[in-house]
């Protein structure tokens, strides 16, 4: 009997492979996971009709595009980021869908992430965001953003990673890798030169090739070549008189030509303007366009999109071949195989404690201690009996508003509540005074905060109450700054002024006079004027840090966490300390009378400062800013010493490694960021005094020391040569400058490139 059973098993086993092989032969190549992806794409394209091809390259709703149901490709869903997954809107309207499962964790704004100077935080950020997106059924997150901080008036700076192309390049890559490791596509934006918001649909940027390649493109290039991003979003603005959603130079020549990008180019919503350019100049997926006279309010307008019926009709009439169409379809199908057709894509989860922990950790590492006179911070919880909290930003929800990054959160802990909880553990009384009234609205696109911030008292009454309470407090902590209302840190418009709004300067000076233990916490994504800096004991840059904002700020202020953030931009004293404003090139010059109200009018904005953005400009002009790029204090002290290199001469195809010793000389555990800048001693072209080319964050216990090494190659020594349209590293003498901020580089090492 046993022998008979064994014979049967062997017979079945012999039959099974042939059946499996037969099944594989019957399986279409485009569904066969054993075949190379490009072969599967070829097969899918060969099976698709013209209508099916057209259908997948434009939107079918506010945030989705069609799949190919006949072949088993599902619909493709995008959603706004980059700080959390935006709540769902109706299929064809911008109103909220009214769902009960589309809350999210709000992660810190990308300025805060950049201020961590820690690529590990970027990876954690991307992974957590990807998991939330998966749970919500999203295939692409519209972010991260890496436009350069050119002017502090840009209403959208809070969504970006600062002024330095090297810092942004290093920080964006792990974010993309973390997000896409979950099978969710990144869509890096806004490519490119979208450096102010006010006239973003009409501004034509005039910039030198050198500045374009050295300042404004490197982070996008890193996103493509190192991050391997699957998506790029075109910007609204024009470059060389072509909109960047269908721009021959930026998309065809640079992105898809020079960088060999194999992903999709997605239009920003309403960013396509021309059929022929949309077809020929690199746009792959069109979203949100208002064409043929249709307005923003038009419904079911998708057939009128340039890459919809107008494109199909033009092909049928012989105006275009299917060559460009098949390239677009190939890229979209490649995206499908990476996301919706990926059988190994994990399951997501939403609002988990691990995600809140990630948000808090990122926030704590990004908060910057700017000033700490007489060691006013951290709050001495052993001696303090009463702490006064002042300011609207101590109680106002900051996750709602700001434009497309507005979120519907499961929870947001305010700074006031965070301090009450933390200080309450030590029996410390926490009092509150409003101090000023700013933006009392709590509604953005149907998402409401549920807060009533109305206060009818006069400015004088509000200040008087705060000052009176401040006189008897052990500490006064004011949470001020900006918010996410229009003309502040908000998409679509720029700030009107560099100064703090709502007469906060007057309140700050009064509080600083009333209590010597006064700490100002600036909540914003931008720098602000600080004419009262010398009168204030402590200054903290608190950013927009999302769901765990109160917890993270309380941890920093009480010393439970040691601040280690560093500024990702130069904090200037006034607008005239930036090239864009010193040279009067912002916001540009209108071509016709009537400005923005004249239909079709274009405003030309010339970046006359060239490569001199941020610290490059202040170095050139010998300006001492309020706070330098890379500046950030700690509750402990560090010594950076003994700079050495593994060689003094470097070949063109070689590398050089610099090593320093970092020691925690204080009494608290903490982290320091070692920054390496390169100075070209003599060059054939004008070069910045120094440029960031390496950094590393190191965590040390009291008394602990470590050697930190940073290796560079000739890329770190190169400039973009306009004559040859290529990067060039000239032989000669260079210096490595090492320290912990752009204005604190005490170590120098000479070397030579030959």
Language-model regions, residue ranges each:
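Acidic/proline-rich low-complexity IDRs
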Residues: 2-5, 9, 506, 582, ...
């Amino acid at each position: 009997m046993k022998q008979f059973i064994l014979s049967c098993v062997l017979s079945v086993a012999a039959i099974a492979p042939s059946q499996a092989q037969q099944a594989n032969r019957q399986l279409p190549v485009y569904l066969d996971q054993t075949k190379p992806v490009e072969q599967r794409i070829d097969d899918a394209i060969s099976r698709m009709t013209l209508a099916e091809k057209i259908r997948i390259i434009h939107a079918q709703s506010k945030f989705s595009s069609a799949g190919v149901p006949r072949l088993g490709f599902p619909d493709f869903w995008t959603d706004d980021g980059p700080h959390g997954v935006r709540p769902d809107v109706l299929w064809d309207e911008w109103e909220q869908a009214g769902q009960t499962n589309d809350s999210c964790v709000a992660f810190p704004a990308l300025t805060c992430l950049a201020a961590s100077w820690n690529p590990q935080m970027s990876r954690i950020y991307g992974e957590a965001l990807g998991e939330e997106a998966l749970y919500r059924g999203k295939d692409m997150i519209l972010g991260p953003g890496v436009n350069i901080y050119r002017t502090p008036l840009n209403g959208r700076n809070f969504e970006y990673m600062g002024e330095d192309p090297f810092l942004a390049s290093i920080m964006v890559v792990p974010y993309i890798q973390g997000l896409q490791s979950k099978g969710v596509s990144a869509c890096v934006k806004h490519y490119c030169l979208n450096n102010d918001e006010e006239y973003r649909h009409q501004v034509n940027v005039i910039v030198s090739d050198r500045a374009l390649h050295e300042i404004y493109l490197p982070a996008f290039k890193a996103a493509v070549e190192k991050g391997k991003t699957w998506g790029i979003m075109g910007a609204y603005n024009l470059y060389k008189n072509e909109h960047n959603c269908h721009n021959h130079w930026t998309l065809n020549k640079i992105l898809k030509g020079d960088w060999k990008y194999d992903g999709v180019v997605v239009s920003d919503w309403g960013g396509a303007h021309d059929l022929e350019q949309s077809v020929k100049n690199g746009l792959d997926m069109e979203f949100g366009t208002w064409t043929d006279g249709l307005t923003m309010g038009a419904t079911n307008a998708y057939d009128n999109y340039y890459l919809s019926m107008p494109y199909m009709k033009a092909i049928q009439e012989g105006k275009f071949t299917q060559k460009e169409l098949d390239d677009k379809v190939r890229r979209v199908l490649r995206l499908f195989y990476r996301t919706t057709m990926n059988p190994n894509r994990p399951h997501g989860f939403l609002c988990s404690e691990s995600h809140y922990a990630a948000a808090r950790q990122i926030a704590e590492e990004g908060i910057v201690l700017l000033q700490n006179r007489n060691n006013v911070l951290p709050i001495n919880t052993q001696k303090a009996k009463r702490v006064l909290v002042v300011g609207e930003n101590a109680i106002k929800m900051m996750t709602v508003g700001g434009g497309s990054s507005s979120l519907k959160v499961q929870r947001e802990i305010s700074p006031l509540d965070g301090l009450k909880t933390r200080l309450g553990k030590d029996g410390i009384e926490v009092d509150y005074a409003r101090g000023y009234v700013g933006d009392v609205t709590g509604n953005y696109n149907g998402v409401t905060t549920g807060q009533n911030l109305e206060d009818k008292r006069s400015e004088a009454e509000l200040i008087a109450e705060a000052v009176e309470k401040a006189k008897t407090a052990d500490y006064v902590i004011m949470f001020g700054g900006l918010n996410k209302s229009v003309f502040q840190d908000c998409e679509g418009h720029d700030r009107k002024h560099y100064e703090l709004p709502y007469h906060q300067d007057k309140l700050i000076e009064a509080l600083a006079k009333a209590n010597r233990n006064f700490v100002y916490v600036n909540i914003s994504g931008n720098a602000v004027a600080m004419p009262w800096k010398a009168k204030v004991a402590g200054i903290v840059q608190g950013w927009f840090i999302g769901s765990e904002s109160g917890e993270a700020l309380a941890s920093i202020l009480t010393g439970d966490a040691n601040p280690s953030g560093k500024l990702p931009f130069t904090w200037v004293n006034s607008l005239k300390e930036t090239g864009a404003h010193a040279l009067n090139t912002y916001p540009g010059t209108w071509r016709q009378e009537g400005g923005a109200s004249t239909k079709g009018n274009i405003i030309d904005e010339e970046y006359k400062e060239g490569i001199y953005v941020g610290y490059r400009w202040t170095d050139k002009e010998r300006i001492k800013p309020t706070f330098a790029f890379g500046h950030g204090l700690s509750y402990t002290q560090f010594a950076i010493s003994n700079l050495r290199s593994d060689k003094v001469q470097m070949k063109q195809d070689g590398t050089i490694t610099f090593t320093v010793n970092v020691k925690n000389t204080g009494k608290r555990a903490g982290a320091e960021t070692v920054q390496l800048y390169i100075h070209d001693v003599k060059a054939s072209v004008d070069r910045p005094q120094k440029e960031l080319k390496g950094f590393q964050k190191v965590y040390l216990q009291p008394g602990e020391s470590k050697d930190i090494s940073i290796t560079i190659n000739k890329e770190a020594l190169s400039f973009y040569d306009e004559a040859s349209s290529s990067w060039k590293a000239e032989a000669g003498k260079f210096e490595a400058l090492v320290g912990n901020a752009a204005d604190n580089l005490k170590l120098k090492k000479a070397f030579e490139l030959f």
